[in-house]
Amino acid sequence: KYLHKNEKLLIDGCHSLASAKNLNDYLKSLNGPIYGICGIQKNKKHEKFIKIFKKTFKQLITVNIPNESNSLEKNKLALIAKKNSLEAYSAKNIVSALIRISSEDNKTIVIFGSLYLIGDVLKNN
């Protein structure tokens, strides 16, 4: 109910550098703008992970991973993204992020960065 008919939603549990590269390679094959929603664990290589998507996302929205004490704080993740030349913002949660970027325009929205985040998305939506 938060997406328009011209929008595609992709969810990917990628959380390692190798899986981020694979996701990024796939995203490069898509047409149209791509928006990301990302939450990641503190123990990951945040800078390298985000840098992989540097030229892929039109905008990146960062979120905390719900009920996960090891979640990297969303504002810290947004700062890392901005340092890597991404237009980035933080959102309260997945729903807030979807509301922020959803519109009538054709686009792909990708939720990624943690299996815990994806599990929460699937459980609640």
Language-model features: locations:
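Nucleotide phosphate-binding/pyrophosphate-handling subdomain across enzymes
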Residues: 1-59
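C-terminal helical cap/extension that packs against the catalytic core
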Residues: 8-11, 50-108
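Short, active-site-adjacent cap segments at secondary-structure transitions
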Residues: 117-119
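Active-site-proximal loop/hinge segments that shape catalytic or ion-binding/gating pockets
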Residues: 114
